From Swiss-Prot:
The gene is frr. GO terms for biological process: cytoplasmic translational termination. It is found in: Cytoplasm. The keyword Cytoplasm applies. One of its GO terms (molecular function) is ribosomal large subunit binding. It comes from Aromatoleum aromaticum (strain DSM 19018 / LMG 30748 / EbN1). Disulfide bonds: none annotated. Belongs to the RRF family. It holds the Pfam family RRF. InterPro entries: Ribosome_recyc_fac (IPR002661), Ribosome_recyc_fac_dom (IPR023584), RRF_sf (IPR036191). Responsible for the release of ribosomes from messenger RNA at the termination of protein biosynthesis. May increase the efficiency of translation by recycling ribosomes from one round of translation to another. NCBIfam families: frr. GO terms for cellular component: cytosol. This is Ribosome-recycling factor. Keywords: Cytoplasm, Protein biosynthesis. The lineage of its organism: Bacteria, Pseudomonadati, Pseudomonadota, Betaproteobacteria, Rhodocyclales.
């Protein structure tokens, strides 16, 4: 019972970190990267699909993303979807490719984005702690039902605490990297 509990708790904690990584990838820094447009959806024959399913998204240079749409009629829809996204980007249609220049971030915007990053990180830490609490509750219930001994309970709680500490440290590292990336000019 205890090994399965540890394994499922570890998997759930890893999923929380994966969600944080995905959320942090959406936060725009001054540099261009293709993952920035991953969550932008465009209407394609009546259904909403990610831009990557109707075009090639590439880097032209460090501050410009290129979007090469496969079907000409979709150019304006893709351009509008990028413009209407919450990223604050202004795409330019150049016939066969849509250029998406990355505007420089102001100091105020950088601070706002840093707050957003910290908030996302705190939410991930809360999720990790909640998973620890749930695992510890399962252990307490097992002790009460006399399925495991109190010594096993204590050892398992220590292991889960180590797992929690390791994941919290990884979250802190991810946040520090993203904040440093945001504050670079």
């Amino acid at each position: 019972m205890i090994p399965e509990l540890k394994k499922t708790t570890e998997q759930k904690m890893q999923k929380s970190i994966d969600v944080l990584k995905a959320d942090l990838a959406k936060v725009r820094t001054g540099r261009a990267h293709t993952g920035l447009l991953d969550h932008v959806m465009v209407e394609y024959y009546g259904s909403m699909v990610p831009i990557s399913q109707v075009s090639n998204v590439t880097l032209i240079d460090a501050r410009t993303i290129g979007v090469q749409v496969w079907e000409k009629p979709m150019m304006q829809k893709v351009e509008r979807a990028i413009r209407d996204s919450d990223l604050g980007l202004n795409p330019a249609n150049q016939g066969d490719i849509i250029r998406v220049p990355m505007p420089a971030l102001t100091e105020e915007r950088r601070r706002d984005l840093t707050k957003v990053v910290r908030h996302e990180g705190e939410a991930a830490k809360v999720a990790i702690r909640n998973l620890r609490r749930d695992a510890n509750q399962h252990l307490k219930d097992a002790v009460k039902d006399k399925t495991i001994s109190e010594d096993d309970d204590r050892r398992a709680q220590e292991d889960i605490q180590k797992l929690t500490d390791r994941n919290i440290a990884e979250i802190d590292k991810l946040l520090a990297q993203k904040e440093q990336e945001l504050m670079q000019l």
